[in-house]
Swiss-Prot record:
Superkingdom of the source species: Eukaryota
Protein name: Transcriptional activator FLO8
Spans annotated as Disordered: 1-22, 37-68, 101-127, 255-406, 431-501, 568-621, 644-691, 705-758
Biased segments, Basic residues type: 354-370, 482-497
Chief location: nucleus
Domain LisH: 73-105
Record's keyword terms, sorted: Activator, Nucleus, Transcription, Transcription regulation
Length: 799
């Protein structure tokens, strides 16, 4: 086959010798197909453009007319005004308005329910559709507009308008919040894209808003970088971080001479770091203590807070975080020198103590020396020595009238501290040290050998106290008293009077004639547990002979009688002449300590006394044997705990009444007698000789009538009916009781004393040398029951 034949038929398959021609053919064919496709697309696009142009050109005239009406709003308003005037029956007004506004007057007659295009000649415009309403659309629109306007401008409005307006505001507020959060989310996304940390995450704006507000929700998007989606930190509560320091309660009075010592550390609420750094020998005023009574059940009838700078106790002022162990650290000098065991609770007489002093020798001297340094008010760390209650194994710190321990001026403030001192409440704030042991030397010997220090800062003492002999380097004797308070069930008077106690340091009496019993004074650690208190149902726990489970006396005292103390000369005027001059500024007080020792070795060592007598225990440091008490009102009854009824002695041992005048009304005549024929004592001053009582029943001094086991109150002829003349000296063995006039007159149970006759006259009650028989139990109980501060005026120990 020739080439021409093949070349003449281009559609035929070329020979294999010509491969280039075949490939070129294929390319030409593909290019032709593409050109045909492009031409078809171009044709379609042209057709679409033509159609769109035709649509814009062929738009309906209605849309153009509406646009014209919107552009001519005044004409629309005129139409609605004309409609309102026509429907309001204002035809003349409507015709005049149509003429002036160039409106068709027949417009009102035409139906308005549909659109009607009416072309008028001249300047007439095409009217649009007018909404048909009963009173005209303009009027109804105006009502709605005015109601909404009043609601939005806070001028009132209807209830529906107010609800609608609140819904509109809420919707707008939500849209605004969402819009702002969306903008913030877009900003975060944009920042992440710029840092290259965005990986097509979608952030929910509402979730992001919750995260930004600090709500505990999962993060909106788990970002790869922590800084992209930080966890919100809650606000710090200020009640935890605002720990303000408590300033110290400093109420130092310049007249008291108390020098305020600046604290070494700033005051704060933590008590653990302040106590050990303070000097215990100073008047520590930097301790942050509370001055509010934490226990309202404690004896504080007035309710005044006490000054806790120096006299803070645990009874009325308890700091919530103030523990005894963390407040103070025990110094080496605070350890008690001679602390006997709890077995040594029996009392010892003065004679046995004198014998023990001789036998002790050098040991007793060293012991006395150490004890003197312990009690010394002028030592470096001397504080309040401890006074042991009879029968108790724990010591109560007593107030020492020294410059170290400064008491507040207020008596009520002192009462808070005195309660804890006497009745077992430990005073963790006081600068206390161990009390001296009485094994080596008697308190009278210590008082005679060691002179007391004159107090510079004198303050009033409110209640009775345990007096303690205080020693110092300076010479001179002064009154040094401790203070105690009444038990919680005692009625405390609000009078701020100052009883006085004469503390005679001249040991002129023989120790064998002192007739005093001293319980073995035990001074354990100051942080030891307080003694257990015995529940007392009586309103006033009194002086109970033979009772070793409670203090001997718990009666608050009152003012000083005029016959005993001369404020001008500063001396005590007694029957035997003026006593040793005391500091008139110092107000001391003393309890009536009467206790009966138990039978034992100490009882056998005591000299035999007259049967039927009791032993009066003077306070610590007194070298006297006589006691003067001024009573305002008191009556004698028998003890309720008497089990064996005994008869009064016969003959001359009957109870003899001694009558004396009031020491404040007539000082010179104290032994005025009454006639034996008197059935009832008519004088306000009367007394009874207790030395004549041998084995009778127990005696009580309450505000009650006399009652005996063998006699009725109206048949008590041995007490008040038989009187005889008897004198009383300062050192004799007789006991003179001078109660008020109602002692003898209120013998019947129907006659009761009142508060009016209790405060009529103050009488003197004097106890002489009263002892006790050897190997014999207590015969009498001397109690003061149902009394208060108004029943006592004065307690005076004479020596």
């Amino acid at each position: 086959m020739s080439y021409k034949v093949n070349s003449s038929y281009p559609d035929s398959i070329p020979p294999t010798e010509q491969p280039y021609m075949a490939s070129q053919y294929k390319q030409d064919l593909q290019s032709n197909i593409a050109m045909a496709t492009n031409s078809e697309q171009q044709r379609q696009q042209q057709q679409q453009q033509q159609q769109q142009q035709q649509q814009w050109i062929n738009q309906p005239t209605a849309e153009n007319s509406d646009l014209k009406e919107k552009m001519n709003c005044k004409n629309t308003l005129n139409e609605y005004i004309f409609d309102f005037l026509t429907k309001s029956s204002l035809k003349n007004t409507a015709a005049a308005f149509a003429q002036d506004a160039h409106l068709d007057r027949d417009k009102g007659q035409n139906p308005v329910d549909g659109p009607k295009s009416k072309e008028n000649n001249g300047n007439q415009n095409t009217f649009s559709k007018v909404v048909d309403t009963p009173q005209g659309f303009l009027y109804e629109w105006w009502q709605i507009f005015w109601d909404i306007f009043n609601t939005s401008s806070s001028r009132g409005g209807s209830e529906f308008a107010q609800q609608y307006y609140q819904l509109v505001l809420q919707e707008q507020r939500q849209e605004q919040i969402y819009r702002s959060l969306a903008v913030h989310a877009a900003r975060l996304q944009h920042d992440a894209e710029r840092r290259g940390e965005y990986s097509n995450e979608d952030i929910d704006p509402m979730h992001l808003a919750a995260m930004m507000l600090g709500n505990p929700m999962a993060p909106a998007v788990q970002m790869r970088n922590v800084n992209m989606n930080p966890i919100p930190i809650p606000m710090v509560g200020n009640p935890i971080v605002n720990n303000f320091s408590i300033p110290p309660y400093n109420n130092a009075n310049p007249t008291t001479g108390a020098t305020a010592v600046a604290p070494t550390a700033p005051p704060s609420g933590d008590f653990t770091n302040v106590g050990p750094t303070q000097n215990r020998s100073q008047n520590v005023t930097g301790w942050p203590v509370y001055n509010y009574p934490m226990q309202p059940t404690t004896e504080n009838p007035v309710g005044n807070p006490c000054n806790n700078n120096t006299t803070n106790n645990t009874t009325n002022n308890k700091s919530p975080v103030n523990q005894p162990k963390s407040l103070k650290t025990m110094h080496s000098t605070d350890k008690p020198n001679n602390v006997p065991t709890s077995k040594s609770t029996r009392s010892r007489s003065a004679t046995s103590k004198a014998k023990g002093k001789v036998k002790a020798g050098l040991v007793a001297k060293r012991r006395r020396k150490n004890n003197t340094a312990t009690v010394s008010a002028g030592s470096t760390n001397a504080g309040s020595p401890n006074i042991t209650t009879p029968g108790s194994t724990t010591s109560e710190p007593a107030m020492v009238g020294s410059r170290v321990n400064k008491t507040p001026r207020s008596d009520i403030a002192t009462n808070f501290r005195n309660q804890a001192i006497i009745f077992g409440e430990e005073d963790i704030y006081s600068n206390s040290k161990s009390s001296p042991s009485l094994d080596g030397a008697s308190p009278s010997a210590l008082a005679s050998k060691q002179p007391t220090k004159v107090r510079k800062n004198t303050k009033k003492a409110s209640t009775s106290a345990f007096p303690v002999e205080s020693t110092n380097k300076l010479g001179g004797n002064s009154v040094v008293t401790g203070k105690k308070r009444s038990p919680p069930n005692t009625r405390v008077s609000r009078r701020k009077s100052t009883p006085s106690v004469i503390l005679n340091a001249d040991a002129t009496k023989d120790e064998n004639n002192m007739l005093r019993t001293f319980s073995n004074t035990i001074a354990p650690n100051i942080h030891s547990a307080p003694p257990t208190k015995t529940a007392n149902s009586l309103p006033f726990p009194g002086i109970n002979l033979g009772s070793f489970n409670k203090p001997a006396v718990s009666s608050p005292l009152s003012s000083v009688t005029e016959s005993c103390f001369d404020p001008e000369s500063g001396k005590i005027a007694g029957k035997n002449g003026p006593k040793r001059a005391v500091n008139s500024k110092v107000s001391a007080s003393s309890p009536l300590s009467i206790a009966t020792p138990r039978s034992g070795d100490a009882q056998k060592q005591r000299s035999s006394k007259v049967p039927g007598n009791v032993v009066i225990k003077p306070p610590h440091g007194f070298s006297t044997t006589n006691l003067n008490i001024t009573l305002k009102n008191s009556k004698i009854i028998t003890s309720q705990n008497n089990t064996v009824s005994q008869e009064l002695p016969n003959g001359g041992n009957i109870l003899e009444a001694q009558v004396g005048n009031d020491s404040r009304s007539s000082k010179g005549n104290r032994n005025t007698l009454s006639t034996p024929e008197e059935k009832k004592p008519s004088s306000n001053n009367q007394g009874y000789d207790f030395d004549a009582l041998k084995n009778s029943s127990s005696l009580l001094f309450p505000n009650q009538a006399y009652a005996s086991n063998n006699r009725t109150p109206n048949e008590n002829s041995n007490v008040a009916d038989e009187t005889s003349a008897s004198t009383n000296s300062g050192d004799n063995d007789n006991t003179l009781i001078q109660p008020s006039s109602n002692v003898g007159t209120t013998l019947g149970p129907q006659q009761t004393s009142t508060n009016e006759n209790q405060n009529v006259h103050s009488q003197n009650l004097k106890f002489g040398n009263i002892g006790m028989v050897e190997d014999q139990g207590p015969d009498y109980d001397l109690n003061l029951l149902d009394t208060n501060e108004n029943d006592f005026n004065f307690i005076n120990w004479e020596g």
